[in-house]
UniProtKB/Swiss-Prot annotation:
Effect of E38K: Loss of interaction with DnaA but not Spo0A
Assembly information from the UniProt record: Interacts with domain IV of DnaA and with Spo0A.
Descriptive protein name: Small protein YqaH
Pfam family, one: YqaH
Source species of the chain: Bacillus subtilis (strain 168)
Result after altering K17E: Loss of interaction with DnaA but not Spo0A, partially prevents toxic effects of ectopic overexpression during normal growth and sporulation
Keyword rRNA processing: no
Length: 85
C-alpha cells in the first residue's frame, strides 16, 4: 500500500479505509460466487464510498505537495474563503 500521497495525519485513516475496502472486495467476490446479488450491490456501494473517501484524502495530500512546490518557486499563496450568502 503506497501512502505517499496522503498527509501524515491522514495516513492511519487512509490505511483503515483501504483495508476495509480490500475486505469488502473479498466479500463481494464471495457474494457474486454465491449468487447473492442484493448483498453484492450493497457491498459494491460500500466499496464505492470508501474509495471516494480515499481519493479525497489523496487529493488533499497532492494539493498540499503542489502548494509547497509553488511556494518554493517563489509564488505567494494565501487561503481565500468565500461567503455563501
Amino acid at each position: 500500500m503506497n501512502t505517499n500521497h496522503f498527509l501524515k495525519a491522514d495516513v492511519p485513516i487512509a490505511k483503515r479505509k483501504i483495508e476495509s475496502a480490500e475486505e469488502l472486495s473479498i466479500m463481494l467476490s464471495e457474494a457474486l460466487r454465491d449468487g447473492d446479488y442484493e448483498e453484492a450491490i450493497s457491498l459494491a456501494g460500500s466499496i464505492k464510498v470508501l474509495t471516494e473517501d480515499i481519493s479525497r484524502l489523496a487529493n488533499k495530500g497532492r494539493l498540499y505537495e503542489t502548494a509547497l512546490k509553488m511556494q518554493q518557486q517563489g509564488i505567494n499563496l494565501t487561503v481565500v474563503s468565500r461567503c455563501i450568502g
